């Protein structure tokens, strides 16, 4: 059974859909690559704190997203809002095993978990894959949960103030089957993932 979103998530998405489609002219491509059912890790480049927004709207209303949010967001009065919006806390700057375990379990339960391998927003002008240090968390979660690892490229979220067009491109799941049992599986999968993300950003 596909997990269902909270009423707050539905409200946010319903209000956001005409805003993103109209004001920001949101366009997406490659949705045919997304698994129709079941959990998976959706990994994208990280331009701004608004990155989950267009991802969620392009999949609404058929699927909804879960994503890590910095632990500072989970203080009253924002905790209930963040949780209802699909977020769960992560302590940035350290290996948060609890957040990783939560993400892995959510994938196993059929959720789509959004990850940003770069960990933090790219500095202005940072575009090439060798300039952005990627973490292996997204690949580790996909490998541990035995779910697809799907790349996405996001363009425009760092220029919302200029009403830049928002574009999202999805790619086919990263090849993981040949990595079974390899100690370097997370690193190799991450290298493949980041190469795919960079191609999607360029073509979005």
What label would you give each PLM region?
Residues 9, 15-46:
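Helix-to-loop junction immediately C-terminal to a conserved catalytic motif
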Residues 19-21, 60, 81-82, 106, ...:
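A generic structural signal for well-ordered alpha-helical segments
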Residues 12, 35-94:
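Catalytic core of membrane glycerolipid acyltransferases/transacylases, capturing the structured
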Residues 1-25, 75-85, 160-163:
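Alpha-helical membrane-targeting segments
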Residues 28, 75, 97-100:
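Structural motif corresponding to alpha-helix initiation and N-cap regions
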Residues 2-8, 98-204:
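Non-catalytic C-terminal accessory region of glycerolipid acyltransferases
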């Amino acid at each position: 059974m596909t997990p269902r979103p909270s009423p707050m998530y539905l409200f946010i998405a319903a209000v956001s859909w005409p805003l993103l489609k109209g004001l920001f002219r949101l366009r997406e491509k490659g949705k045919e690559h997304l698994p129709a059912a079941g959990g998976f890790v959706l990994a994208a480049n990280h331009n701004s704190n608004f990155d989950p927004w267009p991802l969620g709207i392009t999949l609404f209303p058929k699927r909804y997203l879960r994503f890590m949010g910095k632990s500072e967001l989970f203080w009253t009065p924002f905790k209930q809002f963040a949780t209802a919006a699909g977020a769960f806390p992560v302590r940035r700057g350290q290996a948060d095993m609890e957040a990783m375990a939560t993400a892995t379990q959510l994938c196993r339960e059929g959720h789509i978990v959004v990850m940003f391998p770069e960990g933090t927003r790219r500095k202005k002008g940072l575009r090439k894959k060798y300039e952005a240090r990627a973490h292996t968390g997204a690949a580790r979660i996909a490998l541990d949960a035995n779910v697809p690892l799907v790349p996405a490229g996001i363009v425009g979220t760092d220029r919302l103030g200029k009403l830049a067009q928002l574009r999202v491109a999805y790619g086919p799941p990263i090849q993981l089957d040949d990595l079974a049992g390899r100690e370097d599986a997370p690193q190799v999968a991450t290298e493949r993932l980041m190469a795919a993300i960079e191609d999607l950003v360029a073509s979005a």
